[in-house]
């Protein structure tokens, strides 16, 4: 096999360097612009496992990489907006959209600084029950950055019975 180099965003969480690789495939041109490093995947491996150490080559100054805020979890346009505002202040927020539960797992494992989430519990409460379940004794701060109303949009007037007979296109992953 051949060694492979994968573009990634890197940041320092507590005392560990964390790399978040960009997905392979379409859109790679923007990955070059947004990446902070290249990760080396050895020739004898197809991929790296989560948490596995590897060599990385920084493409930004070390001091910049140390100040990156890694945000992993649900995709929320508000985070993108905040990242744009932070950039003007010299703060780089790098987000990866993996879904609320995967974001909480990354936060628990120390792989990110922040985890956007929107999880509705069986009792109708958002987020707090999941934090209590997965972070029992740890000190966390839950910041509500906004509320939103979501729905299903259609060109035709539909009722709930029509949901079974129509096709829907889901949003992006995360």
Segments from the language model and where they lie:
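N-terminal winged-helix
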Residues: 69-88
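Short loop->beta-strand "edge-of-pocket" segments that line small-molecule binding or catalytic clefts
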Residues: 66-75, 160-174
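Flexible glycine/proline-rich
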Residues: 1-66
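Short, surface-exposed beta-edge/turn micro-motifs
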Residues: 3, 35-36, 148-150, 165-166
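Short, solvent-exposed amphipathic alpha-helical segments in soluble enzyme
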Residues: 9-12, 85-89
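N-terminal segment of the mature folded domain
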Residues: 87-160
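Conserved beta-strand termini and adjacent loop/short-helix elements that scaffold enzyme active sites
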Residues: 22, 74, 96-98, 145, ...
